[in-house]
Amino acid sequence: MTSQRSTSGQRHEQARIGIMPPEILQKRDPVAVRRILESLPDWFGDPGAIDNYEMAAADIEFVSIVAVDSGNVIGVSLTRRHFRESAELHLIAVDPMARGRGIGRALIDHVAADLRNDGCMLLSVHTVGPSFENEPYAHSRAFYRATGFHPLEEHNNLDWAGPILILVRKL
């Protein structure tokens, strides 16, 4: 009995101080996508790109997974299945107030498990390439590497005029 009370008490304390893991679920929330992207100007400074991501969040071509904490969406991911064997992580973003809590990793792990369970073998993601020196995107590349992605190739003029790094993760 004591250990159950202790565990229950620990959960209540975690909830009280806001460190409970978020709920990860499939949900479309274009408004939350816009809100989170607008709060990350180092990565999403182009209003047109934010408009496009907001539209993608409403598009059934994309699977939208969100992280919810105390009723608020604090993280978003959009994936698109190109072929049965492969998918693209089109967007992942976490509210800056929730960064460092493992939300991004939880979203990617959830997406990867869902895709793997559906027969997908490979997940790709595009980000600004290392030949364009930019500290926020250096953090993004390190995050992707830490979550199991490996660099495949870098191209210019793919998603923007500069270099794009394509990373892949075996599922």
Q: Would you name each region that the model predicts?
A:
Residues 115-136:
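Conserved GNAT acetyl-CoA-binding A-motif
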Residues 24-91, 95, 108-109, 114, ...:
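Acetyl-CoA-dependent GNAT
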Residues 1-28, 171:
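Conserved N-terminal entry element of GNAT/NAT acetyltransferase domains
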